[in-house]
């Protein structure tokens, strides 16, 4: 990892240079805003040493719930490994703390939209195999992730060697499950407030139980079924308050049998969810068993892990836009006719995370997706439009009454 901690000196800390350009550290130029959230904003940046674009996460120093420094510490703990974004710098930037990171490509949620909200068995199996290894690595560093959702898994930038690698980003909700002082597993507790994304979080999380490694795996299983079905049975539930909605989501998860959730799909998906839900709080998961479940799905399909995902031909068929940046750069970053940089929603998701909602029970963070509960369920947004303070895009309307037909 090439990250460095910025000092408080005038020479190394972020300043406005003689040309009036805002800088982070000695060589990172701060550009336009491409994303925002409750705890700060995301800026496009540029490394003036090599002209590569970066993502710069900014958090006010006076934030009431600072998390950027903790996220930076977790990235240092994780180090350099496949599927983790490279961190270049952490330090002050005026009234902000700044985290400078590798700019990645599209999120799985963006790619899901690109594929008309349907992934094939082959694609989901390959995604599952990568993400199980990714979560396994995080767990080996004594961290639990606690923020599984499609927006937090990104491919590398287009036309680079990382374009088929799924990266795990946004460790603002991660937690050490091994006590640093004692070297022992954290204690089992109940009556915890919700932390994570309601759509994907485990049943035990809804029940207020302390999270451990098992909960990351169960949340992955819910996300895999989301990709296969197109939606989950607990999406689009209405309630007067967020607390009541989370309660309804949890109740529906408990009432939906695994066999019903996974009906029409290979039994390995049901086996995986049953396994994750039966794990003990302290238990080390058998990651190889989980990985091989999805490898067997590929084997029965007569397929190999060839990195040919459903989105691959769709991205390959995207023509290079007029006036775009150098062809080796991501198609996320483009130039308008005026020469201004324009970044897609995928790039804005990268390394940033989503809007957070504080649960009134205890003040821990409940992670919501960018739009509503996890996301507005397909087909129940009457306007068909997704909005936030930075983006507006049109979405096709879909029916979510039945799972997508697997071909």
From Swiss-Prot:
| Family statement drawn from the similarity comment of this UniProt entry | Belongs to the protein kinase superfamily. CK1 Ser/Thr protein kinase family. Casein kinase I subfamily.
What name does this protein carry?
Casein kinase I gamma
The EC number of this protein is: 2.7.11.1
Tissue expr:
Broadly expressed; expression observed in pharynx, head neurons, hypodermis, intestine, ventral cord, dorsal cord, vulval muscles and body-wall muscles.
Q: Which GO terms describe its cellular component?
A: aster; cell cortex; cytoplasm; nucleus; plasma membrane
**Keyword Nucleotide-binding appears in the UniProt entry:** yes
The record's GO molecular-function terms, alphabetically, read: ATP binding; protein serine kinase activity; protein serine/threonine kinase activity
Q: Where is the active site?
A: 147
**Top-rank taxon, per record:** Eukaryota
Kindly list the biological process annotations in GO that this record carries. asymmetric cell division; endocytosis; first cell cycle pseudocleavage; meiotic cell cycle; positive regulation of canonical Wnt signaling pathway; protein localization; regulation of mitotic spindle elongation; regulation of protein localization
Annotated binding of ATP, by residue: 34-42, 57
* One Pfam family in the UniProt entry: Pkinase
Where are the annotated segments for Putative palmitoylation signal? Answer: 386-394
Q: What's the miscellaneous note?
A: Shares partial functional conservation with human CSNK1G1, CSNK1G2 and CSNK1G3 in reverting increased survival in excess iodide.
Where is this chain's protein located in or outside the cell? Cytoplasm, Cell cortex; Cytoplasm
Keywords on this record? ATP-binding, Cell cycle, Cell division, Cytoplasm, Kinase, Meiosis, Nucleotide-binding, Serine/threonine-protein kinase, Transferase
Q: Describe the subunit structure.
A: Interacts with doxa-1.
Function, as annotated? Involved in the asymmetric cell division of the embryo downstream of par-2 and par-3 by regulating the asymmetric cortical distribution of pkk-1, a phosphatidylinositol 4,5-bisphosphate-producing enzyme, which in turn regulates the asymmetrical distribution of grp-1, grp-2 and lin-5. Prevents expulsion of the entire meiotic spindle into a polar body by negatively regulating the Rho GTPase signaling pathway. Involved in regulation of reactive oxygen species (ROS) levels.
* Keyword field contains Cell cycle: yes
InterPro entries on file:
CK1_Ser-Thr_kinase, Kinase-like_dom_sf, Prot_kinase_dom, Protein_kinase_ATP_BS, Ser/Thr_kinase_AS
Effect annotated for changing residue 161 to H: In mac397; increases survival in excess iodide
């Amino acid at each position: 990892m090439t990250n460095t901690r910025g000092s408080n000196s005038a020479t190394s800390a972020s300043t406005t240079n003689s040309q009036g350009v805002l800088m982070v550290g000695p060589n990172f130029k701060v550009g336009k805003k491409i994303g925002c959230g409750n705890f700060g904003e995301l800026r496009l940046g540029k490394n003036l040493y090599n002209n590569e674009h970066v993502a710069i996460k900014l958090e006010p120093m006076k934030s009431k719930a600072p998390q950027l420094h903790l996220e930076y510490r977790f990235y240092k703990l994780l180090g350099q490994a496949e599927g983790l974004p490279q961190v270049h710098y952490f330090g002050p930037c005026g009234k902000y703390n700044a985290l400078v990171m590798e700019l990645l490509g599209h999120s799985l949620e963006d790619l899901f939209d690109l594929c008309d909200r349907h992934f094939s068995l082959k694609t989901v199996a390959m995604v599952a195999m990568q993400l199980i290894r990714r979560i396994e690595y995080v767990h080996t560093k004594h961290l639990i992730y606690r923020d599984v959702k499609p927006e937090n898994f990104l491919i590398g930038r287009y036309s680079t060697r990382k374009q088929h690698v799924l990266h795990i980003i946004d460790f603002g909700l991660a937690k050490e499950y091994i006590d640093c002082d004692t070297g022992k597993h954290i204690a089992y507790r109940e009556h915890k407030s919700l932390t994570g994304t309601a759509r994907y979080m485990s049943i035990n999380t809804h029940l207020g139980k302390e999270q451990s490694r098992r909960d990351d795996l169960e949340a992955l299983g819910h996300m895999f079924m989301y990709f296969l079905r197109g939606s989950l049975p607990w999406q689009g539930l209405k309630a007067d308050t967020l607390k009541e909605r989370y309660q309804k989501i949890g109740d529906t998860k408990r009432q939906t049998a695994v066999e019903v959730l996974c009906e029409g799909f290979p039994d390995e998906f049901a086996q995986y969810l049953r396994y994750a839900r039966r794990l003990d709080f302290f238990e080390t998961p058998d990651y190889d068993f989980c990985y091989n479940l999805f490898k067997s799905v590929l084997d029965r399909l007569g397929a190999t892990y060839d990195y040919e995902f459903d989105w691959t031909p769709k991205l390959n068929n995207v023509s290079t836009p007029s006036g775009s940046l150098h062809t080796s750069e991501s198609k996320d970053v483009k130039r308008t006719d005026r020469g201004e940089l324009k970044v897609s929603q995928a790039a804005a998701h990268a390394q940033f995370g989503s809007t957070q909602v504080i649960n009134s029970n205890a003040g821990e963070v409940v992670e919501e997706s960018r739009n509503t509960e996890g996301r507005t369920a397909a087909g129940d947004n009457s306007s068909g439009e997704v909005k936030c303070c930075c983006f507006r895009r049109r979405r096709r309307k879909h029916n979510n009454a039945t799972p997508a037909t697997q071909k």
